Design a protein with these regions (language model features):
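Active-site diphosphate/adenylate-binding microenvironment
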Residues: 8-94
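Thiamine diphosphate
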Residues: 58-250
Length: 250
C-alpha cells in the first residue's frame, strides 16, 4: 500500500507540475514560482532553506524540490511575520551551513534590526526577498473576501516598503537586485561566497497563490461562513453588510 501510494504521488507530481512555462514571463515582474524553480537548480544538499509567513509559506512547500540533506524550516502553526530573519541566525550559528530564508518584503522589514547581528558575525545567510511591493497574501485575501477592496496592503493605500539597498548598505551587507529572470545567474554567483547577502527580487505585484481551495464557480466561502455552518437565513439576518453566500446548498 505504501509503495503504491508513493508511486501515485510521483505520478501526480509529473502529471500536474507546480511550475509551468507561463511563469517565465517576467514582463510585469518575476513570478514567485520561477524564483523557486531557479533555487531548485541553484541550491545544493548542504543548504538549509527557510520560509516566513505569507506568500513564501504557501509556495515553498509545493514549489521547492528538496534534495537529500537539505532541510526546509518554517513556522506554519504561528505564521508569525518576521520570524525567518532572526530564526535564520540561530540556524546558521548552530549548523554552520549556508542558510537561505525566503521572505516577503513585508515580513522582512518587521525584524530588520536583526541584520546587525548577521553583519557582526558575518553569517552565511542568503536572504531571498520576494519583493511584490506590499502584503501580497493579505491583498489577495482582501480582494477575494471584500469585493476587491484593499487597505493597508500596498503603496496606494498606506503601505510603504523601504529601500532595501540602503538598508543593506547601512548594515554593511552585500546587496543584489534581480529585476529579470535573465539576471538569475547573479543569484547563483552569490552562493559562491561565504557571506551574508540580501537578494532583492522584483516580483509581480499581482499573483495568485496556487493551488487553493475554492468552489467550482471560482469563489471562496468567506470567513463568516465557517463550520459548524449556520443557515443562509441566519447569516443574512445577522450580517451588518450584504455578505456573499457561496457555499453549495446541496
Amino acid at each position: 500500500m505504501a509503495r503504491s501510494w508513493t508511486k501515485a504521488c510521483a505520478r501526480w507530481k509529473d502529471q500536474w507540475p507546480v511550475f509551468n512555462e507561463d511563469y517565465l514571463d517576467d514582463s510585469n515582474g518575476i513570478n514567485m514560482y520561477a524564483v523557486l524553480e531557479h533555487l531548485n537548480k541553484t541550491t545544493n544538499d548542504n543548504h538549509i532553506l527557510m520560509t516566513d509567513a505569507g506568500s513564501g509559506s504557501y509556495i515553498c512547500p509545493v514549489g521547492l524540490n528538496l534534495k537529500s540533506g537539505q532541510r526546509l524550516i518554517s513556522s506554519p502553526s504561528q505564521a508569525d511575520m518576521g520570524w525567518a530573519l532572526p530564526a535564520s541566525i540561530g540556524v546558521a550559528v548552530e549548523s554552520g551551513r549556508c542558510v537561505v530564508p525566503i521572505i516577503g518584503d513585508g515580513s522582512f522589514m518587521t525584524n530588520i534590526q536583526e541584520l546587525a547581528t548577521v553583519s557582526y558575525h558575518n553569517l552565511n545567510i542568503k536572504f531571498i526577498i520576494l519583493n511584490n511591493n506590499g502584503y501580497l497574501s493579505i491583498k489577495n485575501t482582501q480582494s477575494k473576501y471584500f469585493d476587491g477592496r484593499v487597505y493597508g496592503a500596498e503603496c496606494e493605500n498606506g503601505f510603504r516598503i523601504p529601500d532595501f539597498e540602503g538598508i543593506a548598505s547601512g548594515f554593511g551587507i552585500e546587496y543584489q537586485k534581480i529585476e529579470k529572470l535573465s539576471d538569475s545567474d547573479l543569484i547563483s554567483e552569490q552562493f559562491l561566497h561565504n557571506r551574508p547577502v540580501i537578494i532583492d527580487i522584483v516580483c509581480r505585484t499581482e499573483q495568485e497563490i496556487l493551488p487553493y481551495q475554492a468552489l467550482k464557480n471560482g469563489q471562496q466561502a468567506g470567513p463568516h461562513d465557517m463550520a459548524p455552518f449556520l443557515s443562509e437565513k441566519i447569516i443574512k439576518e445577522e450580517a451588518f453588510v450584504d455578505l456573499p453566500y457561496v457555499r453549495s446548498k446541496e
